[in-house]
Amino acid sequence: MSETTQAAAIQAAAVAENERAPLKIALGIEYDGSQYYGWQRQIDVASVQACLEKALSKVADEPIEVLCAGRTDAGVHGTGQVVHFTTQAIRKDAAWTMGVNANLPPDIAVRWVKAVHEDFHARFSATARRYRYIIYNHRYRPAVLSHGMTHFYHPLDVERMERAGQCLLGENDFTSFRAVQCQSRTPWRNVNHLKVTRHGNYIVVDIKANAFVHHMVRNIVGSLMDVGCGNRPESWIAELLAAKDRTLAGATARAEGLYLVAVDYPARFALPQPTMGPLFLAD
């Protein structure tokens, strides 16, 4: 083959590569948010998104931008975050998992990979999100895993917290549990699961909804803790919900106890469903 013919073949292959429809890939992501200024890429501060995109771009050998199921705030963690991206790069699954993990810092990891249909969207295809909030309920603060839970030294009655929270189930106006700076067009959300359980010195508040307004879980937890320690009656949560006034509710619980543990999608996408966690917690 002459040099001219060889060059033409290489050029034709490059053109064909560029004209090929891009692949859409979904990833499951786990991260410890303690050292990051939230999920979203920002200028001059560390973010989970920026670290992930840098690692993916290196493996793909092209710029990669990801879209996520839900943006988490500074200090918030994830065991069940889902993202998607499009790429012209053809790689084995091991490259998108182990290869990307080799280029990520130790506190971010890819848990699974799946090629998805072109109509999949990590955010808009999701039908529900699930969060767990971890409280270390002991007189003395923890030293181990202190950035992965919130310490509360007054004894908490989980039965009171559980009963008080049941009024939040269903579709409601969550203005009383919505951050003032929330940009959502509506405060209405549909909560279909809320459980409060104790595991020794650890308390878990487990909430699932179609979506959440800004700081909704942390604001609910802050008010439930007021009920749990006896500062407020069980009926107070229902009163707050009806009042639609954020200034009447409890303080926002700290970020370090919060985990995005799962995102639900229609069965037709057949996404992997790993254990939610965090740590010792079963599904």
Swiss-Prot record:
This is tRNA pseudouridine synthase A. It comes from Pectobacterium atrosepticum (strain SCRI 1043 / ATCC BAA-672) (Erwinia carotovora subsp. atroseptica). Substrate binds at residue 131. The lineage of its organism: Bacteria, Pseudomonadati, Pseudomonadota, Gammaproteobacteria, Enterobacterales. Belongs to the tRNA pseudouridine synthase TruA family. Homodimer. GO terms for biological process: tRNA pseudouridine synthesis. Keywords: Isomerase, tRNA processing. It comes from the Bacteria. It is an enzyme of class 5 (isomerase). Coiled coil: none annotated. PANTHER family: PSEUDOURIDYLATE SYNTHASE, TRNA PSEUDOURIDINE SYNTHASE-LIKE 1. InterPro entries: PsdUridine_synth_cat_dom_sf, PsdUridine_synth_TruA, PsdUridine_synth_TruA_a/b_dom, PsdUridine_synth_TruA_C, TruA/RsuA/RluB/E/F_N. The active site is at 73 (nucleophile). Pfam families: PseudoU_synth_1.
